[in-house]
Amino acid sequence: MPVSRYAVFGHPVAHSLSPAIHTEFGKQTGIALDYTAIDAPLEDFSAALQRFADEGGKGANVTLPLKEAAYALASSLSDRARLAGAVNTLVRNDGQWQGDNTDGAGLVRDLTERQGLDLRGRRVLLLGAGGAARGVAPALLEAGITAMVVVNRSPERADALCDALGEPARVTSRYIEDLRELGDFELIVNATAAGRDRDAGAFALPLGLVNSLTAAVDLNYGDTAIAFLAWARAAQCRYAIDGLGMLVEQAAESFALWHGVRPDTDPVYAALRAREAVLVSAD
């Protein structure tokens, strides 16, 4: 029986844990697959994806900085991908790529089921407005948060995200210079790559953003999450959570789309958490 081919596309992508995660999912479910990492700069992504399809690729994950490009290349889109304006999962069907976004479902599943958080009624600060932020914002709204404030270094992108979400009563954008005026939040989500340079000062955020219930969540993991989580602990956030659980859960969502079966994420998460020192950055 031929082995089906899958891949994760990104730039850079050598650090990605997705090949290890999907290989373990395959072993667990008895599904034979070949899953590799393919480095593709933005300008080469379309051609690289076409080569992958020509060579028999059945599905792909997409990480930074290609999620919005994947959205544009998909022939059809799921509702959640359309709302996000970004794609992290591609399914090959009848010679066409179908785009989906499992990031938000992965984040909410990790926060509610693994971390035990009730997201209902929380006021949320979302840092960033790129593909990662777009992927999680709709799912957070669906989970029952009260309000979301989007802050991004480029205000135009924050405005565009808010417009796309279409819930002006719950979602607003503010300038990064306004952080001290925003009050406190029960959930602060870092959807930026500002920690990639390991700059401890990258997250000199006002302490007034934090209250006694605040959960601070970085969508990154490993070294890239260190600066934000260090701020969260110094600010005495009740929870400081990295993106490893989200990574595993969104991968399980993608796996289910491709294979029709959802794997058990707990053993894979536990194994990766035990290797935490070697983790680098987020998918």
UniProtKB/Swiss-Prot annotation:
Q: Tell me which EC number(s) this protein carries.
A: 1.1.1.25
Domain of life per record = Bacteria
Q: Which residues bind NADP(+)?
A: D79, G128, A129, G130, G131, A132, G243
Key words, A-Z: Amino-acid biosynthesis, Aromatic amino acid biosynthesis, NADP, Oxidoreductase
Cross-referenced Pfam families, in alphabetical order? Answer: SDH_C, Shikimate_DH, Shikimate_dh_N
InterPro entries documented for this protein: Aminoacid_DH-like_N_sf, NAD(P)-bd_dom_sf, SDH_C, Shikimate_DH, Shikimate_DH-bd_N, Shikimate_DH_fam, Shikm_DH/Glu-tRNA_Rdtase
User: Which cellular component appears as one GO term in the record?
Assistant: cytosol
One Gene Ontology molecular-function label: NADP binding
Q: Where is the signal peptide?
A: none
Record pathway: Metabolic intermediate biosynthesis; chorismate biosynthesis; chorismate from D-erythrose 4-phosphate and phosphoenolpyruvate: step 4/7
Catalytic site positions: K67 (proton acceptor)
Which residues of the sequence carry a binding annotation for shikimate? S16, L17, S18, T63, N88, D103
Disulfide bridges in this chain? none
Supply the CDD domains for this chain. NAD_bind_Shikimate_DH (cd01065)
Listed under GO biological process in this entry are: amino acid biosynthetic process; aromatic amino acid family biosynthetic process; chorismate biosynthetic process; shikimate metabolic process
Q: Which family does it belong to?
A: Belongs to the shikimate dehydrogenase family.
Which PANTHER family does this entry report, sorted A to Z? BIFUNCTIONAL 3-DEHYDROQUINATE DEHYDRATASE_SHIKIMATE DEHYDROGENASE, CHLOROPLASTIC (PTHR21089:SF1), SHIKIMATE DEHYDROGENASE (PTHR21089)
Function per UniProt = Involved in the biosynthesis of the chorismate, which leads to the biosynthesis of aromatic amino acids. Catalyzes the reversible NADPH linked reduction of 3-dehydroshikimate (DHSA) to yield shikimate (SA).
Subunit structure as annotated in this protein's UniProt entry: Homodimer.
Q: Which HAMAP family match?
A: Shikimate_DH_AroE (MF_00222)
Protein name, as recorded:
Shikimate dehydrogenase (NADP(+))
Question: What gene does the UniProt entry assign to this protein?
Answer: aroE
